[in-house]
Amino acid sequence: MLRDKPAAMVAASPKATVPVLVLEDGAVIDESIDIMRWALRRNDPEDWLAGDDTELIDRFDDRFKHHLDRYKYPDRHQAEPVAHRTAGLALLGEMEQRLATHTNLCRETRALADIAIMPFVRQFAAVDRAWFDAQPVPRVQGWLARHVASPLFDRAMLRVACWAPRTAPIMSSSAE
């Protein structure tokens, strides 16, 4: 569980949030997008870095995530969930327009922007699925459905035992 944080993780990254990647030289990377870019610079079989739209990813990591957290956890943030849901939907409207051009956010095939943003949209949709499904964003809904139905998503969401120091690493095969 996220509340059961290994001491080694907290020592490596005092902000104590997942993910944390400790490199062989001791350097620590503790932001999801930075870990993704680090990994893709080493192996990018689908050329995802070609779809690294930093501005779009940052907008969702910052503005959309802000509204998502307050919509999903209004008590924790002392927030009005409907106002934040509305603001999140406005950003999904921008995404809807973008998806009118391509099947994915930057091109026809998935890229880094899709993989970085999809978890936020998935969480937003899950708060009230019936409401989300009734919204006028059919391209976003289809985009999300395709990503969630992909074998890559199944492998990424595989449940594994909580990490502990000196445990064997869990390795994954190719993307699909």
Predicted regions and their residues:
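Acidic/histidine-enriched, glycine/proline-rich intrinsically disordered or flexible terminal extensions
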Residues: 160-176
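GST-like fold's C-terminal all-alpha helical module
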Residues: 56-149
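Extracellular ligand-binding/catalytic regions of CAZymes and related secreted enzymes
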Residues: 157
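Residue-level "edge-of-site" marker
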Residues: 1-2, 137, 160-161
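A short hydrophobic/aromatic micro-motif that marks alpha-helical segments and, especially, helix-coil
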Residues: 46-47, 129, 165-166
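GST-like domain detector, emphasizing the conserved glutathione-binding G-site
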Residues: 1-90, 103
